[in-house]
C-alpha cells in the first residue's frame, strides 16, 4: 500500500444489481486505464492513485474474484466485504458492512451470506439475515456501523440511549473489530449522526472511519445512477414521491477530496488506512479440489481407473471391429499412454466421476450424447463409456483433449436428453451430498434494446417514441449501442435511421446518451444452462451460494455466487451437463419404432449400433440435400452444399460439419471438386498423405495441424498442441520462435528451409479456423443417426421432431411441410385418437398431438387420454364433458379443440358442436354441483362412458370455409383443412408460374448459385414474381414493413422499404391476395428465402384491371344451360373484359361447335366469385382468363 492516508471501505458495484453504476473489469488487464473499454472501478482507482479498495455489494460476493484479480494486476490491495441487510421482527431492516480480516473471515462471510439466501427471504422481496446469524459467524470479520444501521434508526427517532446500547451490544460481539462509519455526502441526518457517533466513540473507545458510501465513479454519473435505481424500483425519475436516498456526492472521491472533507476528524481518515492494513484476505486461486470418488478398499484411484479401462476396452472390442490398420496391441498401447498421462497429471478421479454419472444415466435409459468437444478423442473415455465413438478409426488425438505438456483441467462437455438431464444432476447430488453439489450462477446484463426501453420508461418518454428507437437497433446477437450508432470497429451493424434521428432529435439524444451509460451493466442473476460443480467439502467452504425462493420463503435450487470462470479460479471443478433436444427426438423416435416392432415381433432398433455405411441414408438424405430436421444439416445453405458435395461416407460428414463455417467455407468448392475428381488432390509433402487423405489434401481440422507439426517438424503431439494454440493467438514473437523450431525439425527430415516455411505458413493459415475434429466426429454421428431414422422410419422420426417443438408454431408448420414432402399422411387432432404428442400410428401416418393446440395444457390432454383408455371413445360432446374433469376442461380449452377440429367426431359439424357448447357446459356444471352435494340423480348409470342425462341439442349448417380455416390457424398456427389461397391457386399460378414451396424457390435461385469452382460468399438477388395470401404484417419504424405470404405450399417473408413502401404501403394488409415483384434471395438469418418488394398488386384489383379476355367452353345442349350461364354473367356487368365462348350445341345434324365473341355492354368484371360460379356450373368444361399483366407491359 502507498502512503495515502485514506482508503474507501464501502463501495457498491454493478453487482449490487440495483443501486450502482460502477463496473468491475471482466478481465484483469482491463484494470489498466489504457486497456479499459469503459471506465471501471480499478481503472479509476489507478488514475486517483488509491492504495486499496473494499467492494461491499449488497448481500453478495458476486464480484469478488474479478475484483481481486484485477486489483492485484494494478497493485491495488483488494479488500473483501459485503453490505448485509439485517432483519428482526420489531424493527425496519437495517444495514451493516462486514469486511474480511483474512481467509477465515471470508469463509464466515460466505456462510453468513449463503444462509441469508437459503433461509432469509423476505415476503416483500430480497433477503436479510438475522442478528443471531451474524453473532454465529462474526469471527475474523470487521464491522462498520453507520447511519443506516439500527443504531442510526434509533438515534433518528430520538432514542440516543437505545442507539448507544445497540452499539455497545455489537462492540461486545466484534470487540476492536467494530468501527463507526461517518459520511458527508449531503444527505439529511448525516451530521447529527456523525456527532452522536463521535460521542459514543469517545466514551466506548470505538474507532470511527470516514466513508463516501460510493455508488458511482464521477459526479456526472449521478443521473445514470438515479436512472438505474428507478429501473430497479419501477419508478420514474421525475416522480415527486420516489425516495431520494442518494446524493450526487457519492462518487469515488480522491484521497485529497476525502482529506478536505474530514479535515476536522483526521482520525477518521487514518483509521481507514489502519483497518485496510488489518484486512489481508488471500484467495487461493488456481488449485483444483476434486471431490472424493469412492473406490474399493484394496484399490486406489489410479489402480481402479486402469482396471476399469482395460475391462471396458475388452467389452468394447467384443462389439466393435478394430479400426482399419490397427491391431489389438495398438489399442492397448494407446490406452496405456492415455492412462499414464491421466495418472501423472492427477486426473484419475475426474475421469471416474464423469464415467460414474454417465454410466448411471445410461443404466436408467437416459439418452446421452456420443461425445462433445475434444473429449471424444480419448480412448479411455470410450472404454469407460463416457463417449460412444472409437477415436482410432478417425485419427482423433488425445493430446487435443489433455496435453501432458500443458497442465490444465480436462473438461468433458456432456449432452443429455433435455427431458431427463435433471435426473442425472439429482443423482450426483445424492451421491456426493447436496451441500457439495450446485449449479453455477450466470449474470444477465442490460442489453442494447432493453436498456433503451428501460431508460425511456424512467424518463417518462412516450411509448411510441421509445419503441420506434428500440426497433431501429438491428437484431444482431450481442450488438451494442455503439455498433448501432456506427461507432464500432466496422459499420456492419450501423442503423442509418437511428443515427439520423439521434442527430436531429433532442429527446433521442437524451435517451441514447443515458442508455449508453447503463448499457451492459449487470442486471440480474440466474442459472447457467449446464454448469455443475462438485466439491470435496460443503460448497460454502469455497464460495457463497445464491438461491431463488419457494412459496414458503425458503431458498431453492441454490447456485454458486461465482460464475463459471470464477468457480474454477477458487478450485471447484466444473462439469457441463448440457441439454441437447436432438437426443430427446432420437429417443422418442426409437421408442416408437421399437413399440411397433414389438407388436410385429421384429428385433428392436439399437441406435448406438448402426452401420455407418448405409447407402440409402447417404443417397436419399445427405446427397440429395433432403436434410430438413437432420441435426446440423438442416439449413438451406447446408442442403445446397450437400447436393454439390454428395457425401457417401462418414468421413465426408465430419468434414462438411467442420467446413460449413465462416472462413473455411471458402474451401468447400475445392473440397467438392477434389472429392469428385474434377481437381487433382495435391499434398504439401508426401509424408502428409495419411494425415490429409480423408479431406483430399485440404487442412480442415486442428488435429491435422498438430499431426503436420509432428510428422514434418518433429514436434511431439503435446508440443504440437502448444504450436496450434500459438498460431491461433498470432503473437509475432511466439510465432518466430516456433518457426525456427519447425525449420530445425524439418531439416532433420531432409527438408530445406524454404519448403519448411511454405508448410509452416500453410499450417498457420489453417490453424486460424481449423475445427476440432473430435467434436465434429461426435456430432456427425448424431447427425447420421437422425438421417438414418428419417430415411428408414420417417413417420416416427417426424412425429418425434414435431413433438419436440410443439410450442413453436413456426417450426411445427415447417416440419409438417416436410412430413408431407415425405408422403406422410398427417391426421388432424382427434380426442378419440390423439395423445398429447404427435404420434406415428402407421409407417406412413402421423396423428396430430393434442398438446399442439393453443390453449390446451398438458394436464388436460393427459386426462382426456387416460379417460379414453379406461372407458373407450367419446361419443358426444356431452359424453366428453361429463367424463373429463371440469376443473381441467374449461370453456377456453373446449373452444380451442372445436376450432382445431379435435371434436369433429362428436357432432354433425364444427358449427353445431360450438352451438351446443353453452348448454352442455351448463348441464355438466349442474351435474358436478349435484355430485359434490351428494344429490346424484344424474349418475345412476354404472358405466361412466354413458351419461344418464340426455339433452336435445341443436344443430346447424357448417361454418363457411374461411371461418373454419381461420379457427384452425388461431388454434394450430396453420390452416389444416385447406388454405384460403386454394380457390385462387389455378388462376394465380397461370399468372406467376410457381408456388412458394422451397423447391420452387430453390429452382428460381438455382441458375444464380455458385458452381463447384466458383467462390462466392454473397448471395445475389434474382428478380421474380410471386404471389400469396398476406398472413402477417410487421412494421419496423416508419420506413420498413415485413409481410409474410403463404399459399398453402410454402411461405416467404417480403420486405418493403422507403420508395416501395410509399407507393404500395396501402396494399400491405392482412388477408389480401398479393402479387409481388422484387429481388428473391436466400435469407441465412431465418434459414429460408426472402423477397425485397419493388412493386406489388392486389390480385382482385389486378383481375379487374388487366384481364384481356375470359375464355369459356360451354355445353349448351341442355335446355336451361344458356339461361344459367347468362344469369351468372349478367351479375358481373358492366365490365371491361370481353368474352369468347366456345359453344357446343344441338342441331338437326347432331352436335355442332361454334364460337361467340361478346364485348362492349356484354363485357364483364373479372372477380373470383364469378370464376367460382362458372367453374361450378356443369355446362362449363373449360375456363381460362387471359391477362396482360403489368409487369410484362
From Swiss-Prot:
It catalyses: DNA(n) + a 2'-deoxyribonucleoside 5'-triphosphate = DNA(n+1) + diphosphate. Disulfide bonds: none annotated. SUPFAM superfamilies: Nucleic acid-binding proteins, PHP domain-like. GO terms for biological process: DNA replication. Keywords: Cytoplasm, DNA replication, DNA-directed DNA polymerase, Nucleotidyltransferase, Transferase. Its main location: cytoplasm. DNA polymerase III contains a core (composed of alpha, epsilon and theta chains) that associates with a tau subunit. This core dimerizes to form the PolIII' complex. PolIII' associates with the gamma complex (composed of gamma, delta, delta', psi and chi chains) and with the beta chain to form the complete DNA polymerase III complex. DNA polymerase III is a complex, multichain enzyme responsible for most of the replicative synthesis in bacteria. This DNA polymerase also exhibits 3' to 5' exonuclease activity. The alpha chain is the DNA polymerase. This is DNA polymerase III subunit alpha. Its EC number is 2.7.7.7. It is found in: Cytoplasm. Gene3D superfamilies: 1.10.150.870, Bacterial DNA polymerase III alpha subunit, thumb domain, Metal-dependent hydrolases, Nucleic acid-binding proteins. GO terms for molecular function: 3'-5' exonuclease activity; DNA-directed DNA polymerase activity; nucleic acid binding. Pfam families: DNA_pol3_alpha (PF07733), DNA_pol3_finger (PF17657), HHH_6 (PF14579), PHP (PF02811), tRNA_anti-codon (PF01336). GO terms for cellular component: cytoplasm. Belongs to the DNA polymerase type-C family. DnaE subfamily.
Amino acid at each position: 500500500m502507498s502512503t495515502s492516508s485514506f482508503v474507501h471501505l464501502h463501495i457498491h458495484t454493478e453487482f449490487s444489481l440495483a443501486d450502482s453504476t460502477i463496473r468491475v473489469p471482466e478481465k484483469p488487464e482491463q484494470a489498466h486505464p489504457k486497456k479499459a473499454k469503459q471506465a471501471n472501478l480499478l481503472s479509476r482507482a489507478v488514475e486517483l492513485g488509491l492504495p486499496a479498495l473494499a467492494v461491499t455489494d449488497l448481500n453478495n460476493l458476486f464480484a469478488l474474484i474479478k475484483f481481486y484479480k484485477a486489483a492485484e494486476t494494478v497493485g491495488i490491495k483488494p479488500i473483501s466485504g459485503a453490505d448485509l441487510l439485517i432483519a428482526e421482527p420489531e424493527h425496519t431492516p437495517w444495514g451493516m458492512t462486514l469486511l474480511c480480516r483474512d481467509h477465515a473471515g471470508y469463509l464466515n462471510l460466505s456462510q453468513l451470506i449463503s444462509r441469508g439466501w437459503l433461509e432469509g427471504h423476505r415476503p416483500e422481496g430480497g433477503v436479510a439475515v438475522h442478528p443471531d446469524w451474524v453473532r454465529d459467524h462474526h469471527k475474523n470479520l470487521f464491522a462498520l456501523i453507520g447511519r443506516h444501521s439500527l443504531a442510526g434508526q434509533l438515534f433518528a427517532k430520538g432514542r440516543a440511549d437505545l442507539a448507544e446500547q445497540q452499539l455497545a451490544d455489537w462492540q461486545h460481539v466484534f470487540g476492536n473489530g467494530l468501527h463507526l462509519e461517518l459520511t458527508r455526502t449531503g444527505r439529511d441526518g448525516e451530521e447529527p449522526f456523525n456527532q452522536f457517533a463521535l460521542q459514543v466513540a469517545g466514551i466506548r473507545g470505538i474507532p470511527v472511519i470516514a466513508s463516501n458510501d460510493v455508488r458511482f465513479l464521477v459526479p456526472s454519473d449521478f443521473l445514470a445512477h438515479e436512472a438505474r435505481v428507478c429501473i430497479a424500483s419501477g419508478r420514474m425519475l421525475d416522480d415527486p414521491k420516489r425516495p431520494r436516498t442518494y446524493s450526487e456526492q457519492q462518487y469515488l472521491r480522491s484521497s485529497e477530496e476525502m482529506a478536505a472533507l474530514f479535515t476536522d476528524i483526521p482520525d477518521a481518515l487514518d483509521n481507514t488506512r489502519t483497518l485496510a492494513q488489518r484486512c489481508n484476505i488471500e484467495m487461493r486461486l488456481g488449485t483444483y479440489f476434486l471431490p472424493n470418488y469412492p473406490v474399493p478398499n484394496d484399490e486406489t484411484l489410479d489402480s481402479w481407473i486402469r482396471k476399469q479401462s482395460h475391462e471396458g476396452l475388452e467389452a468394447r472390442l467384443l462389439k466393435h471391429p478394430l479400426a482399419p490398420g490397427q491391431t489389438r496391441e495398438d489399442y492397448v498401447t494407446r490406452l496405456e499412454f492415455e492412462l499414464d498421462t491421466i495418472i501423472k497429471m492427477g486426473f484419475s478421479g475426474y475421469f471416474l466421476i464423469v464415467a460414474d454419472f454417465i454410466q448411471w444415466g445410461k443404466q436408467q435409459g437416459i439418452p446421452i450424447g456420443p461425445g462433445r468437444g475434444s473429449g471424444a478423442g480419448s480412448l479411455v473415455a470410450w472404454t469407460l463409456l463416457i463417449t460412444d465413438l472409437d477415436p482410432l478409426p478417425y485419427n482423433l488425438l488425445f493430446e487435443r483433449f489433455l496435453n501432458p505438456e500443458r497442465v490444465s483441467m480436462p473438461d468433458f462437455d456432456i449432452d443429455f436428453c433435455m427431458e431427463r438431464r435433471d435426473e442425472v444432476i439429482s443423482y450426483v447430488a445424492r451421491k456426493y451430498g447436496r451441500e457439495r453439489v450446485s449449479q453455477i450462477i450466470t449474470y444477465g446484463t442490460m442489453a442494447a434494446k432493453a436498456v433503451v426501453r428501460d431508460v425511456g420508461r424512467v424518463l417518462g418518454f412516450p411509448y411510441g417514441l421509445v419503441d420506434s428507437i428500440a426497433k431501429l437497433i438491428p437484431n444482431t446477437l450481442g450488438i451494442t449501442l455503439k455498433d448501432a450508432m456506427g461507432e464500432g470497429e466496422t459499420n456492419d451493424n450501423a442503423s442509418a435511421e437511428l443515427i439520423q434521428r439521434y442527430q436531429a432529435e433532442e429527446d433521442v439524444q437524451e435517451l441514447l446518451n443515458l442508455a449508453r451509460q447503463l448499457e451492459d451493466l449487470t442486471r440480474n442473476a440466474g442459472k447457467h444452462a449446464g454448469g455443475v460443480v462438485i466439491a470435496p467439502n460443503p460448497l460454502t467452504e469455497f464460495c457463497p451460494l445464491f438461491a431463488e425462493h419457494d412459496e414458503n420463503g425458503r431458498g431453492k435450487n441454490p447456485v454458486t455466487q461465482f460464475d463459471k470462470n470464477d468457480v474454477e479460479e477458487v478450485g471447484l471443478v466444473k462439469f457441463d451437463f448440457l441439454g441437447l433436444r436432438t437426443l430427446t427426438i432420437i429417443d422418442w423416435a426409437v421408442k416408437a419404432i421399437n413399440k411397433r416392432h414389438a407388436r410385429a415381433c421384429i428385433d428392436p432398433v439399437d441406435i448406438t449400433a448402426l452401420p455407418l455405411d448405409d447407402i440409402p441414408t447417404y443417397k436419399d438424405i445427405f446427397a440429395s440435400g433432403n436434410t430438413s430436421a437432420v441435426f446440423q444439416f438442416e439449413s438451406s445453405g447446408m442442403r445446397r452444399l450437400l447436393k454439390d458435395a454428395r457425401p457417401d461416407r462418414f468421413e465426408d460428414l465430419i468434414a462438411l460439419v467442420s467446413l460449413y463455417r465462416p472462413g473455411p467455407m471458402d474451401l468447400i468448392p475445392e473440397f467438392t471438386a477434389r472429392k469428385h475428381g474434377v481437381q487433382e488432390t495435391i499434398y504439401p509433402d508426401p509424408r502428409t498423405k495419411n494425415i490429409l487423405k480423408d479431406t483430399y489434401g485440404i487442412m480442415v481440422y486442428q488435429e491435422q495441424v498438430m499431426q503436420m507439426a509432428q510428422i514434418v517438424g518433429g514436434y511431439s503431439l503435446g508440443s504440437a498442441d502448444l504450436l496450434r494454440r500459438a498460431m491461433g493467438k498470432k503473437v509475432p514473437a511466439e510465432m518466430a520462435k516456433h518457426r525456427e523450431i519447425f525449420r530445425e525439425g524439418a531439416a532433420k527430415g531432409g527438408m530445406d528451409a524454404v519448403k519448411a516455411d511454405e508448410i509452416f505458413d500453410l499450417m498457420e493459415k489453417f490453424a486460424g479456423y481449423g475445427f476440432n475434429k473430435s467434436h465434429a466426429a461426435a456430432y456427425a454421428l448424431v447427425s447420421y443417426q437422425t438421417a438414418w431414422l428419417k430415411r428408414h422410419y420417417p413417420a416416427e422420426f417426424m412425429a418425434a421432431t414435431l413433438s419436440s417443438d410443439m410450442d413453436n408454431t413456426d417450426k411445427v408448420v415447417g416440419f409438417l411441410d416436410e412430413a408431407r414432402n415425405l408422403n406422410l399422411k398427417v391426421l388432424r387432432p382427434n380426442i378419440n385418437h390423439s395423445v398429447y404428442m404427435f404420434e406415428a400410428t402407421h409407417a406412413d401416418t402421423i396423428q396430430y398431438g393434442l398438446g399442439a393446440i393453443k390453449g390446451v395444457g398438458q394436464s388436460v390432454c393427459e386426462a382426456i387420454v387416460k379417460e379414453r383408455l379406461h372407458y373407450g371413445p367419446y361419443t358426444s360432446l356431452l359424453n366428453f364433458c361429463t367424463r373429463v374433469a371440469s376443473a381441467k376442461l374449461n370453456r377456453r380449452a373446449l373452444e380451442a379443440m372445436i376450432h382445431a377440429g379435435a371434436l369433429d367426431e362428436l357432432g354433425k359439424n364444427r358449427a353445431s358442436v360450438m352451438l351446443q357448447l353453452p348448454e352442455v357446459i351448463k348441464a355438466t356444471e349442474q351435474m358436478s354441483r349435484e355430485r359434490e352435494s351428494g344429490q346424484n340423480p344424474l349418475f345412476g348409470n354404472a358405466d361412466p362412458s354413458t351419461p344418464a342425462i340426455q339433452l336435445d341439442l341443436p344443430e346447424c349448417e357448417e361454418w363457411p370455409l374461411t371461418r373454419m380455416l381461420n379457427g384452425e390457424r388461431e388454434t394450430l398456427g396453420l390452416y389444416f383443412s385447406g388454405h384460403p389461397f386454394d380457390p385462387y391457386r389455378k388462376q394465380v399460378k397461370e399468372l406467376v408460374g410457381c408456388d412458394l414451396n422451397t423447391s420452387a424457390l430453390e429452382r428460381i435461385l438455382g441458375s444464380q448459385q455458385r458452381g463447384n469452382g466458383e467462390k462466392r460468399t454473397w448471395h445475389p438477388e434474382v428478380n421474380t414474381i410471386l404471389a400469396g395470401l398476406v398472413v402477417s404484417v410487421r412494421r419496423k419504424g416508419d420506413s420498413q414493413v415485413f409481410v409474410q405470404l403463404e399459399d398453402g405450399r410454402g411461405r416467404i417473408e417480403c420486405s418493403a422499404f422507403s420508395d416501395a413502401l410509399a407507393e404500395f404501403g396501402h396494399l400491405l394488409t392482412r388477408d389480401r391476395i398479393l402479387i409481388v415483384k422484387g429481388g428473391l434471395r436466400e435469407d441465412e438469418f431465418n434459414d429460408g428465402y426472402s423477397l425485397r418488394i419493388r412493386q406489388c398488386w392486389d390480385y382482385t384489383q389486378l383481375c379487374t384491371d388487366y384481364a384481356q379476355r375470359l375464355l369459356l367452353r360451354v355445353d349448351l345442349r341442355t335446355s336451361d344451360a344458356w339461361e344459367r350461364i347468362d344469369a351468372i354473367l349478367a351479375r358481373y356487368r358492366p365490365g371491361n373484359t370481353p368474352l369468347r365462348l366456345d359453344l357446343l350445341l344441338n342441331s338437326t345434324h347432331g352436335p355442332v361447335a361454334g364460337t361467340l365473341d361478346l364485348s362492349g355492354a356484354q363485357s364483364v368484371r373479372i372477380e373470383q366469385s364469378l370464376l367460382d360460379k362458372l367453374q361450378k356450373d356443369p355446362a362449363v368444361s373449360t375456363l381460362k382468363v387471359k391477362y396482360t399483366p403489368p409487369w410484362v407491359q
